[in-house]
Amino acid sequence: MGLPALVLVHGGGFAADCWEPTIDVIRILEPELKVLTVDLPGRGNKGGDLITACIDGWVDSVVSDIENAALDDLVIVGHSLAGVTVPGVVTKLGSARVREMILATAQVPTNGSALVDTFPGALSWYARRTAKRNVQKSRSLRPGGLPTALARFVFCNGMTPAQRRFTLAGSCQESPSIMIEKVDRSGMPDEVPRTWILTRRDRAVSMKIQRECIAALGGVQTLIEIDTCHMLMVSEPERLAEILIGRCRLYEQRRP
């Protein structure tokens, strides 16, 4: 059967194409590894209303893409905002199909709370207020969720000029409703191993918040640190590719 497939789920304000630099490296290092990158609804070629979006709808969309690709054995990776989506995908697919869940600098609220609750102090109140207002006025969040100059500061520190251009060009509008919806991870199977990739120079999700999110998840079996910014798939594609390939190889089934 060989290697399990690798499913990559993007975070907020971006689409499936943000993984391209890392996928290019994976194709060189492990050409037999099947990789599926999914667009969440309202991104890329995937239709969807960002204003009325809900977590269950996004979970169903990812599961549908996995089913359409006929993937029965996989490792799933969620970046950033995918911390509210990927656990639901794992719950639906179960431990029989998911070998491991990897969360990279993800935002994981305490069960029963919302993504905005992961923000510190007054920022949480402001983010909730802004998201509610945007839902009421049927306005999606601006590309990347931030003005360009701030997005460059928050997402792109330490990048080369080419990496910054790629990142900012790929930013897109985000759903305000997802930000304030409460999560429910009550059915997530404990049998699926959990790995966390912690970004040490992250200005979007600080190390402190990441550790709080790990605790909210109930802990992880493996913690891998990378000295880079939030968009690690762009800033450190070689290192991330090596990590993801290594995790998949742990579950390789030798052909007779």
Task: Please identify what each model-predicted range represents.
Residues 173-217, 222-237:
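Conserved serine/cysteine hydrolase catalytic core
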Residues 91-92, 96-139, 178:
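Flexible "cap/lid" loop of the alpha/beta hydrolase fold
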Residues 2-47:
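Conserved HGGG/HGGXW glycine-rich cap/lid loop of the alpha/beta-hydrolase fold
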Residues 234-248:
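Post-His helix in hydrolase/transferase enzymes
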Residues 78-82, 86:
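Gly/Ala-rich beta-loop-alpha elbow adjacent to hydrolase catalytic centers
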Residues 138-188:
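Conserved alpha/beta-hydrolase catalytic His-Asp/Glu region
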Residues 34, 40-75, 91-92, 116-120:
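Active-site loop/oxyanion-hole signature of alpha/beta-hydrolase fold enzymes
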